Amino acid sequence: MLSLLPAEEAYWQQVCSPLIALSASLPPVIRCPLNQVLDSEIHRIFTLWPVWLSPLLPLTSSIIERLSLATLCGAWAAAIRDACLDGELTQTAAPLARALWRRSWHLFGTLAVHRELLADLERRMVAAYRQELATRTHTGCWQPTQLQSLTAQWVCARAAGWHVVQRAHIMLAGMKFDDPCAVALSTALDALILARQLRDDVHDLADDVRAGRASWGVRLIAESIWRAEGGPVLIDGQRIAGRWLIDPALRQELASTHATLCQQAMHALMPYAAYIPRLIDLVMIESEAGRTIATINLL
């Protein structure tokens, strides 16, 4: 886990404070998604991403703060939206989600970030979450087509909010998206997203299987079973967990996949390493954390 430096922790608290104040008068059920966002390491990373990018792509402090706040507003809105889609919140919470989206889009708009960029990435996130919901099972079994839909591209679409803040930063810095630096940052971000997701999927495998939740990690394990059996077949959660427990080669394969993704991220960032030390730190920490993948025991 990445430990924040004192200045980073102070910045995080500064950006959070308006949303915490806004939530104080709201019902606890609405505050809960915000608390989940504020407790999440990934959202701290989202919020600090402009700070870490700024030595490479300079922006003024006021622009960085607005970009961070817009990102955090969007994260709270997305958490409420997902809870509504998941049935954890009723649709009575939807107006607040829309208000937060408007606030987020307004902040991005004050920075002249293109609305089309935001709308496209929002559509990708919603479609990916609906796709995830469609793979949940109450029978403990998955059809091949359900798991085959959970691709690496789906993982990145699910995390499109991370790309929002990075692409907005690139745009505000006056760099084109096809610039070699922008391409390298996008490549590194995709690889880091996939590495983090794979590690999370393996750590959460037992809970996910019990709850009937599919994931990219579940899909990769299923593919190992299908290769051994000559083709895709209906598969249940017990077989997924069982294969993980009895197949050390599979565990090593996923650990190697994680290591390769971290190497790809590092390779993309290395030409700019002197300017983005905290991004380099993040990839190194992720690489080190991935060493536990092959030894995770679900029992």
Task: Please name every model-derived segment.
Residues 109-127, 224-273:
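Primarily interfacial, aromatic-capped hydrophobic alpha-helices that serve as membrane anchors
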Residues 14-23, 37-46, 68-70, 102-212:
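All-alpha helical catalytic cores of prenyl diphosphate-utilizing isoprenoid enzymes
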Residues 153-181, 266-299:
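C-terminal intrinsically disordered extensions
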Residues 1-80, 84-86, 117-124, 138-147, ...:
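Conserved N-terminal diphosphate/IPP-binding helix and adjacent helical/loop segment
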Residues 91-94, 119-123, 183-186, 277-285:
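Short, charged, amphipathic alpha-helical segments
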Residues 34-42, 91-97, 151-156, 250-254:
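Solvent-exposed loop and edge beta-strand segments that line ligand/cofactor-binding
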Residues 79-106, 166-177, 189-249:
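Acidic, Mg2+-coordinating active-site segments of isoprenoid diphosphate-utilizing enzymes
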Residues 69-76, 104, 254-257, 261-264:
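Amphipathic alpha-helical protein-interaction segments
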